[in-house]
């Protein structure tokens, strides 16, 4: 028998097409039993709250030779399992003794075939964080033609993350890169808006710096969420609306004004296709537009 004091489990990329009638939600209800003689079994852990791409670590103090997994839910899914050595220097070497699915498409050996990839002290550089457990999962499913777990939001932002996964592989850097780029692109767009409003470079730079230093901007742009994409396109739509509203009624050619409004509308639609919050921004655009038309009409009547 071997001593171990932690059980590491993780659910990563899998085949969600294998059971489309049930959501695969990680270690939903898996019991672990242990024995030293294959006769008497003791339940040592119950895995109930594991999320996709995140480690679930059960702490304890055990000394057993055999481990048995009993799955009580068709929603459960598990990609890899490891048993931390008592001295915390690595994981115990393990092998499969009995497997009812040995000749099936998902043998038990798949649970221990990537022991070298398990992380002793996982951080958010190694696993999903916050809503990444939803968006990254959907992106991976899109990138690989899998049955989708959820479609709460429009899928443009998720498809952008999926494209990055296809290009650079399934890893935290890959799924976080598009949002970081979108966060950077917000700065020149905001600078352009402020330049239209204040006509001053210094104030525009100060406003852009405040956005760059904003905690919420940094937080959402460094993880794989949909906010950076939606907000980037919202800012673009407002830039063109400001461009239209701040132009002179007498000097702005009608064709040019139509182009401004068209670009604003296009970016508005793109923002909504990234996340439903773009709809709220659309209300603001409508208020700006109709207010401007009323002002122009009153100016014309004079």
Put a short name on every predicted segment.
Residues 1-124:
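Aromatic, loop-rich ligand-recognition surfaces of beta-strand-rich domains
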Residues 173, 177-198, 236-240:
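Transmembrane-helix motifs of polytopic, lipid-linked glycan transferases
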Residues 175, 179, 216-229, 277:
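Short acidic/glycine- and proline-prone juxtamembrane loop motifs at membrane-interface regions
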Residues 262-263, 277-295:
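Transmembrane-embedded, aromatic-rich helix segments that form part
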Residues 190-213, 232, 249-256:
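Transmembrane-helix signature of polytopic, membrane-embedded enzymes
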Residues 143-149, 160-181, 200, 215-216:
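Juxtamembrane segments of multi-pass membrane glycosylation machinery
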Residues 101-136, 148-160, 170-173:
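Extracytoplasmic catalytic/substrate-binding loops of multi-pass membrane glycan-assembly enzymes
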Residues 198, 237-260, 271, 293-300:
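Membrane-interface transmembrane helices that cradle and orient dolichyl/undecaprenyl
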């Amino acid at each position: 028998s071997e001593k171990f004091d932690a059980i590491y489990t993780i659910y990563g990329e899998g085949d969600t097409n294998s059971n489309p009638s049930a959501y695969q939600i990680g270690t939903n209800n898996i019991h672990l039993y242990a024995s030293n003689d294959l006769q008497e079994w003791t339940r040592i852990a119950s895995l109930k709250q594991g999320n996709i791409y995140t480690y679930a670590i059960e702490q304890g103090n055990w000394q057993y030779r055999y481990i048995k997994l009993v799955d009580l839910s068709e929603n459960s899914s598990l990609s890899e399992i490891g048993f931390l050595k008592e001295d915390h220097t690595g994981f115990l070497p393990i092998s499969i003794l009995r497997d009812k699915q040995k000749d099936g498409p998902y043998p038990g050996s798949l649970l221990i075939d990537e022991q070298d990839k398990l992380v002793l002290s996982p951080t958010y550089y190694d696993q999903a964080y916050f809503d990444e457990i939803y968006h990254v999962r959907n992106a991976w499913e899109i990138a690989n033609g899998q049955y989708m777990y959820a479609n709460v939001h429009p899928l443009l932002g998720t498809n952008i993350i999926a494209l990055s996964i296809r290009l650079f592989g399934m890893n935290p850097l890959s799924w976080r890169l598009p949002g970081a780029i979108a966060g950077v692109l917000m700065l020149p767009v905001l600078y352009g808006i402020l330049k239209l409003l204040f006509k001053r470079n210094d104030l525009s730079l100060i406003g852009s710096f405040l956005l760059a230093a904003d905690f919420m901007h940094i937080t959402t742009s460094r993880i794989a969420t949909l906010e950076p994409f939606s907000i980037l396109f919202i800012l673009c739509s407002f830039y063109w609306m400001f461009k239209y509203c701040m132009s002179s009624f007498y000097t702005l050619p009608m064709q040019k004004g139509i182009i401004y409004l068209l670009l604003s509308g296009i970016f508005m639609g793109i923002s909504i296709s990234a996340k439903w919050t773009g709809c709220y921004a659309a209300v603001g655009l409508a208020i700006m537009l109709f207010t401007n038309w009323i002002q122009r009409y009153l100016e014309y009547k004079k």
